[in-house]
């Protein structure tokens, strides 16, 4: 019997061994006669030894698996403990931040009350303001020691890279959408500031080549002259609608209102200027009187605008009402007891009725047709808002049947980071269909009363394969588009790119958080700046590998240069503030010397003229008292 026959005959005895194990045994022995009893004993003894060896190897393998499993469990337990500690620390920082916010709110309330007191004092003293003093002027007087000499210039509006933005990302459980947005954050910061500085340093006129045609050619100048580029005002308005506000940008908005109203006395306002004026004064239609065909209007003075602007505003408002389409006026008249808010843009206007219906009226049929075209392409007919078009002359869309952009959902503040993620996801939705919006800015990001985010105003939308002139808002244009325009190229026709919309969304997010970002960077000690890169590396490799792109970008930011830039700006402000303080101190010192001299003259007069001592002394004492009172009033206004 040969070897194959032998193996076949003893198949049951060898069934638990693999073919490789049996071949290995056969190689160890030269078996001439496989049926020899001694040879068979030796063979099966070797088979038994092989079985024992395999069992030992199996036990070792299982033991090694148990050790690895225990190691992984211990590692996961330690990571879970570290995660809990991290979340506790984040919660403590959040509470501390909210406490500071409440303190700032209380401080602002106190400031408003002081301002009201000044206004009442001025009214009592002068009998009435009578249109001679605006709220903005009083506000600037009150804050004169806090603001820099030219507080309405753009030079203090530096948009920093966002360490605070990345902190928000870490605090969220599911926000990997932001990693795509923020991967180019540092590059946007540099180019975005380049444009601002160019406008300031090059004097009164900087011509940007025509974007669409000659009639849209814009001139950028400072706020002391004309013509005035409307989109800079629009950007200021967008920032004011956000969550970050400061004395500096509030004064800028007030200054713009002053300029626009002054211009309206001599020139016809274009639509963006008029829209900015309407939005910032917060005019609302309250009720329509059917019998007398009149609108009763209320104005919210939250922005502290002056009384003398009211007549100018009413004139332009009446002109605008007459141009509203009849079909839309019918809708407004049906809501006679409801509040109707108006928001104005260069291509369309939005009407919010009773916070339940939002209507959008287009100034030109082209933009109406474009918006309907791309909304239908993205969402289909069923997902497209209600659309109405009459006789090719009246074009409007019902944007949302459930309401408007709101500040709170069920009493809870809006989480900007969360909704930015949602807007980013919506942006990726239409870019995946090869459609770009081309005009992403804060006023086009809405949210209805049900909490659903809306990206509106597709009037400038286009397909990515098309080549044509750029249309949209310059301030939030993508980095690529901005470089083309800022380099003064004569031909602005280029293929649009899907990432353009995403970059615009990043710029909107930066403007929303610029103050918080700046405070965070400035608070880092110089000796600890290097730790930030180590921190991002730890998060990248150990905790949140899904945010790899974001953390790698965070490691590359030049924090030293960024902090030095902030400190340099603060030094300029502090120098100006110190100069103003010294000037005020000198004026007070002069008043004190004058009062002392007056009192000395009183004593000399009393000694020289004893017969008129009582009368003269009483008179001079009264004069001194009046002078001191005026000094006190002056200090109150400039404090």
UniProtKB/Swiss-Prot annotation:
Belongs to the protein kinase superfamily. Ser/Thr protein kinase family. Residues 7-122 form a coiled coil. Its EC number is 2.7.11.1. Keywords: ATP-binding, Coiled coil, Kinase, Nucleotide-binding, Serine/threonine-protein kinase, Transferase. It comes from the Eukaryota. It is an enzyme of class 2 (transferase). This is Probable serine/threonine-protein kinase DDB_G0282777. The keyword Kinase applies. InterPro entries: Kinase-like_dom_sf (IPR011009), Tyr_kinase_AS (IPR008266). It comes from Dictyostelium discoideum (Social amoeba). Disulfide bonds: none annotated. The keyword Coiled coil applies. ATP binds at residues 239-247, 284. Residues 233-588 form the Protein kinase domain. Residues 601-639 are annotated as: Disordered. The active site is at 439 (proton acceptor). It catalyses: L-seryl-[protein] + ATP = O-phospho-L-seryl-[protein] + ADP + H(+); L-threonyl-[protein] + ATP = O-phospho-L-threonyl-[protein] + ADP + H(+). One of its GO terms (molecular function) is ATP binding.
């Amino acid at each position: 019997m040969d070897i194959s026959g032998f193996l076949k005959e003893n198949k049951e005895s060898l069934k638990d061994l693999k073919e490789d194990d049996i071949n290995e045994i056969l190689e160890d022995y030269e078996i001439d006669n496989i049926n020899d009893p001694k040879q068979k004993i030796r063979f099966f003894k070797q088979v038994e030894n092989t079985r024992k060896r395999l069992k030992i190897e199996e036990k070792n393998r299982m033991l090694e698996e148990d050790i690895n499993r225990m190691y992984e469990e211990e590692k996961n337990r330690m990571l879970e403990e570290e995660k809990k500690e991290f979340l506790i620390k984040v919660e403590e920082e959040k509470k501390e931040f909210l406490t500071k916010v409440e303190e700032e709110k209380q401080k602002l309330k106190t400031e408003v009350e002081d301002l009201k007191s000044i206004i009442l004092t001025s009214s009592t003293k002068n009998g009435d303001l009578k249109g001679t003093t605006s709220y903005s002027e009083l506000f600037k007087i009150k804050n004169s020691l806090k603001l820099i000499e030219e507080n309405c210039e753009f030079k203090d509006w530096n948009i920093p890279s966002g360490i605070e933005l990345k902190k928000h990302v870490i605090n969220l459980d599911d926000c990997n959408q932001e990693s795509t947005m923020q991967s180019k954050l540092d590059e946007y910061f540099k180019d975005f500031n380049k444009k601002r500085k160019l406008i300031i340093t090059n004097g009164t006129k900087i011509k940007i080549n025509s974007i669409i045609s000659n009639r849209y050619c814009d001139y950028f100048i400072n706020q002391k002259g004309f013509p005035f580029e409307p989109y800079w005002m629009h950007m200021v308005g967008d920032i004011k609608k956000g969550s970050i506000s400061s004395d500096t940008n509030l004064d800028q908005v007030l200054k713009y209102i002053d300029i626009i109203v002054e211009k309206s006395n001599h020139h016809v306002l274009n639509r963006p200027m008029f829209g900015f004026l309407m939005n910032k004064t917060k005019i609302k239609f309250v009720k329509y009187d059917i019998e007398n065909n009149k609108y009763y209007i209320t104005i919210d003075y939250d922005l502290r605008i002056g009384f003398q602007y009211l007549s100018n505003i009413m004139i332009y408002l009446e002109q605008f009402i007459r141009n509203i389409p009849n079909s839309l006026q019918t809708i407004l008249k049906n809501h006679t007891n409801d509040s109707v808010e108006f928001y104005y843009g260069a291509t369309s206007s939005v009407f919010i009725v009773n916070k339940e219906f939002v209507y959008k009226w287009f100034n030109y049929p082209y933009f109406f047709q474009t918006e309907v075209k791309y909304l239908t392409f993205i969402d289909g007919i069923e997902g497209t808002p209600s659309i109405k078009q009459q006789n090719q002359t009246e074009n409007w869309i019902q944007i949302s049947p459930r309401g408007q952009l709101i500040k709170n959902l069920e009493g809870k503040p809006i989480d900007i980071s969360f909704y930015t993620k949602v807007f980013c996801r919506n942006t990726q939705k239409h870019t995946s269909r090869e459609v770009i919006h081309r005009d992403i800015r804060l006023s086009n990001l809405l949210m209805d009363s049900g909490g659903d985010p809306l990206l509106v105003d597709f009037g400038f939308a286009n397909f990515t394969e098309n080549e044509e002139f750029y249309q949209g808002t310059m301030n939030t244009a993508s980095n690529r588009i901005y470089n083309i325009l800022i380099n003064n190229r004569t031909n602005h026709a280029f293929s649009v790119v899907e990432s353009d919309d995403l970059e615009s969304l990043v710029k909107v997010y930066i403007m929303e958080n610029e103050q918080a970002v700046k405070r965070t960077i400035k608070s880092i000690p110089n000796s600890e700046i290097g730790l930030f890169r180590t921190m991002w590396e730890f998060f990248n490799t150990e905790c949140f590998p899904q945010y790899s792109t974001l953390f790698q970008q965070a490691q590359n930011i030049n924090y030293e240069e960024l902090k030095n830039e902030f400190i340099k700006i603060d030094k300029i402000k502090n120098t100006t503030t110190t100069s103003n303080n010294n000037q005020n101190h000198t004026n007070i010192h002069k008043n004190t010397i004058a009062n002392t001299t007056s009192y000395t003259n009183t004593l000399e007069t009393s000694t020289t003229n004893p017969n008129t001592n009582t009368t003269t002394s009483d008179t001079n004492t009264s004069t001194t008292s009046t002078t001191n009172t005026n000094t006190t009033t002056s200090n109150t206004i400039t404090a």
